[in-house]
A protein has these predicted regions:
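Sequence-level preference for short, compositionally simple segments enriched
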Residues: 1-207
């Protein structure tokens, strides 16, 4: 399935708005520019596998707990990949695992994230980061105080944009993956495990 907003570069133009819990997407495309994918629900857990998401400014944004696995995240211009609004006290915000971050020729200055809300969270685990990712990696959205509350981290990323020598000082480099087992990130209180049960879930969908 392809979700596309064809409005062009006119400001916010959401292609897909997700509020419900236990949202599962596999082999889908999300096309747009600013604010392509709105992970809206504060209590929502969302899983994306082998999906393609493209945009420019804050094109993955919202309050939800979201796991991207084996996805391609493509910047079609300068901007910010994510703009999390994670609530205070939430264990996870955005988690990217084994994803590839690519950029169009005109995408030369892209940040991994900036905090839409103070307690924003985004973690990139063993992802391939293209040269369009700026050396600083993270942006504080013009508010120094966000650096004390937002949680941004990386683990064993590769690619031209993965060097940590000039990373923003408020970012973290994980030494291990304690707390980031992909089968536990979305568990919640009901034990939802789309990573393990993904194929079974797809088979149970009535067509």
């Amino acid at each position: 399935i392809t979700f596309e907003n064809t409005a062009g570069r006119v400001g916010q133009a959401v292609a897909c708005f997700i509020e419900g819990d236990r949202a599962y997407f596999k082999n889908c495309r999300f096309l747009g520019n600013q604010d392509t994918l709105y992970n809206y629900g504060k209590e929502s857990r969302q899983y994306f596998e082998n999906c393609y998401v493209e945009g420019t400014v804050d094109f993955i944004f919202g309050w939800s707990t979201v796991l991207f696995k084996d996805c391609t995240i493509h910047s079609v211009g300068d901007g910010y990949v994510t703009a999390p609004a994670t609530d205070k006290g939430k264990k996870y915000g955005y988690v990217f695992v084994n994803c590839k971050l690519t950029g169009a020729d005109e995408a030369k200055k892209v940040y991994l994230s900036r905090p839409w809300r103070p307690y924003a969270q985004a973690v990139y685990i063993q992802c391939e980061l293209g040269k369009h990712i700026v050396p600083e990696g993270w942006n504080n959205w013009g508010k120094k105080e966000n650096e004390k509350t937002a949680y941004y981290a990386e683990y064993q990323n590769t690619g031209e944009g993965a060097s940590v020598k000039e990373r923003a000082s408020f970012g973290h480099q994980l030494k291990n993956l304690d707390g980031y087992n992909v089968e536990e990130i979305l568990l919640g209180e009901d034990g939802w495990n789309p990573v393990k049960n993904g194929n079974k879930l797809l088979k149970n969908i009535k067509r």
